[in-house]
C-alpha cells in the first residue's frame, strides 16, 4: 500500500482551529445555560398522590405549634366494586397529571412515584415547601356511608386558619379553579370547595395548596370510573386546566413565574 503524507497544518492554522472550537464550545455552553435558566424559571407544581401502602398510625401535630394530633398517614379507602385501594388510584392519576402538566410547560415535583413509601402528611407538606414548588396539588378519592354520594370536590384552609393563613386566599382560589375545570372535563357533579383547618397536609404547607377529592369510591359507578384509564386521563387534564386558569387569573404564564 502506498502511503501519502498529508501536509501538517501551520501554527496559524492550528491556532485558528482552536479558536473556532473554543467559540463553538462557548456558544454551546451559553445555549445550555439559557435553556437551564428557562427550565428553572418555569412554574413548578408539587403533586402529592395521597396515602400509601404502609399505614403510619403514630401521631403528629396537625399544624405548627398545635397540641392537636392525628395519625401520620393511612392507606386510604377502597373501591366498593373494584376493591382497588385509594393509594393505587391516587398514584395512577398523579402520574397522568404529571405528564399533562409537563406537556403544558410546567415543572413538576412528585412527592411519591411508588406506593412503597413511608411519608407522613406533615412530611409531604414539608417536602413540597422545600422543593421550591409554587403550588401543591394533593390527589385523593372520597368515601361516604351512603353509596349514592357522588361528585368531586376540593379542600382549602379557611381564611382564619391559625397555621397557614398567609396562603388561605390563594389556596381557595386554586381550589375553586381546579374543581370547576375538573368537573367540566369529566361531567362529575361539582360539590364545590370545602374549607377546613383540620388537614395536616394543608396546615403545614407554606405554598398555596388544594386537596382534590376526585370522586367517591363508595359509589359503585364512580368507583369503576376512577379506575378507568380514559376517565383518569380526563381527571388529569381537568386538574391541569384548573392550574392554567389559576395562573391566567394571576396574569402569570406557564413558562415563567
PLM features: residue spans?
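Catalytic-site microenvironment of enzymes
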Residues: 1-257
Amino acid at each position: 500500500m502506498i502511503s501519502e503524507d498529508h501536509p501538517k497544518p501551520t501554527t496559524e492554522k492550528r491556532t485558528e482551529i482552536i479558536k473556532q472550537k473554543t467559540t463553538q464550545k462557548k456558544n454551546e455552553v451559553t445555549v445550555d445555560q439559557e435553556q437551564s435558566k428557562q427550565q428553572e424559571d418555569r412554574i413548578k407544581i408539587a403533586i402529592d398522590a395521597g396515602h400509601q401502602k404502609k399505614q403510619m398510625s403514630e401521631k403528629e401535630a396537625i399544624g405548627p405549634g398545635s397540641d392537636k394530633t392525628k395519625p401520620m398517614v393511612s392507606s386510604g379507602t377502597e373501591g366498593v366494586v373494584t376493591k382497588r385501594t385509594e393509594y393505587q388510584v391516587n398514584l395512577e392519576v398523579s402520574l397522568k397529571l404529571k405528564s399533562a402538566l409537563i406537556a403544558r410547560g410546567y415543572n413538576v415535583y412528585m412527592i411519591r412515584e411508588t406506593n412503597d413509601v413511608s411519608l407522613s402528611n406533615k412530611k409531604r407538606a414539608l417536602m413540597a415547601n422545600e422543593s421550591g414548588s409554587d403550588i401543591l396539588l394533593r390527589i385523593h378519592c372520597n368515601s361516604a356511608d351512603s353509596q349514592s354520594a357522588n361528585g368531586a370536590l376540593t379542600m382549602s384552609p379557611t381564611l382564619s386558619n391559625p397555621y397557614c393563613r398567609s396562603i388561605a386566599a390563594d389556596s381557595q382560589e386554586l381550589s375553586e379553579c381546579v374543581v370547576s375545570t375538573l368537573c367540566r372535563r369529566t361531567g362529575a357533579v361539582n360539590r364545590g370547595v370545602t374549607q377546613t383547618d383540620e388537614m395536616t397536609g394543608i396546615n403545614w404547607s407554606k405554598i398555596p395548596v388544594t386537596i382534590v377529592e376526585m370522586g367517591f369510591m363508595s359509589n359503585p359507578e364512580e368507583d369503576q370510573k376512577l379506575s378507568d384509564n380514559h376517565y383518569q386521563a380526563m381527571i388529569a387534564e381537568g386538574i391541569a386546566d384548573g392550574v392554567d386558569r389559576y395562573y391566567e387569573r394571576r396574569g402569570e404564564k406557564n413558562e415563567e413565574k
